């Protein structure tokens, strides 16, 4: 059973503090390019995840448009920035395997369930979720402060009011400024936290500290990275959120590459790559269904034989782990 100490600080034996590199704008754009390379090399799972969030974005817009919650459409959409680093944990695992020259299957993303840092990752995810909830609460307070108990009841009158009145523009300006503060906080504490926890089994506190040290050492690069993420999300949201099907996975892979540039590697403390999931895990009906679906997508894309989850031993047959073509 994982101790509370492990969740917050990592293994007691771990004494190496992650060393921060100095990076610049070129590193940000290089990380984005490498993220694109990862996406095109491994498109199946990212497209599946991206489409899920595109649909989620449309659903959020619909829920806020046909009720008395249109004013929360922007804060909810901005939540992608706040919780995105946690959601992309499976994409980090794919990029981690690819950089080591391993063949990557979509179902390999489920091996994060066996990561020794999983409790710390979940705890950090809850922290980001709390920041997101605080942002939504602040947005509601700003709206009530400006519009009182009788706001426009429908979406069209609300949009007309926002774009043509003083209180509407005040809502936009104040809302954007407050949202920027929440986004800056989330970026500063999580810019490399999740990849670092996955890679080295660090606890919540040292991972948060490492992100803050990266931010202090490279304020311009981190600010540029945040701007790239925000701009990409805005562009991805414009065509009815469908652009997020590409933007979110690319940003997930690029975040892993950014982490590699911002933190020096320490092979002695890196967590070994996991093999196939234990049969007890794949016997879980929900996980088994996800496994089969992801494996089927790989079969359709690559033409390889799907993983056999019904082997007599109960253990999924291991795929031969082959280096990528051109891998060192």
Residues of each region from the PLM?
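Hydrophobic alpha-helical membrane segments
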Residues: 1-328
């Amino acid at each position: 059973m994982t101790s509370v100490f492990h969740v917050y600080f990592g293994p007691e034996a771990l004494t190496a503090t992650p060393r921060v590199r100095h990076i610049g704008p070129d590193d940000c754009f290089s990380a984005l390019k490498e993220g694109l390379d990862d996406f095109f090399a491994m498109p199946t799972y990212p497209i599946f995840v991206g489409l899920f969030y595109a649909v989620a974005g449309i659903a959020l817009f619909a829920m806020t448009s046909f009720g008395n919650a249109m004013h929360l459409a922007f804060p909810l959409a901005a939540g992608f920035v706040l919780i995105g680093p946690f959601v992309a944990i499976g994409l980090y695992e794919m990029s981690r395997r690819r950089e080591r020259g391993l063949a990557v299957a979509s179902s390999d993303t489920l091996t994060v369930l066996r990561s020794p840092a999983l409790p710390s990752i979940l705890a950090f995810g809850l922290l980001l979720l709390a920041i997101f909830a605080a942002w939504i609460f602040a947005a509601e307070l700003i709206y009530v402060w400006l519009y009182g108990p009788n706001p426009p009841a429908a979406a069209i009158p609300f949009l007309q009011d926002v774009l043509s009145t003083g209180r509407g523009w005040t809502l936009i300006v104040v809302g954007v400024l407050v949202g920027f503060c929440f986004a800056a906080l989330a970026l500063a504490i999580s810019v490399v936290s999740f990849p670092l926890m996955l890679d080295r089994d660090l606890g919540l506190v040292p991972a948060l500290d490492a992100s803050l040290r990266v931010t202090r050492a490279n304020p311009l690069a981190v600010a540029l990275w945040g701007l790239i993420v925000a701009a990409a999300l805005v562009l991805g949201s414009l065509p009815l959120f469908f652009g997020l099907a590409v933007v979110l996975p690319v940003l997930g892979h690029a975040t892993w590459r950014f982490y590699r540039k911002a933190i020096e590697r320490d092979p002695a403390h890196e967590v070994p790559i996991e093999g196939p999931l234990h049969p007890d895990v794949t016997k879980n009906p929900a996980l088994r269904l996800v496994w089969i679906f992801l494996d089927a997508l790989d079969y359709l894309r690559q033409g390889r034989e799907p993983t056999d989850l019904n082997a007599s031993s109960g253990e999924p047959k291991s795929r031969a782990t082959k280096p990528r073509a051109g891998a060192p």
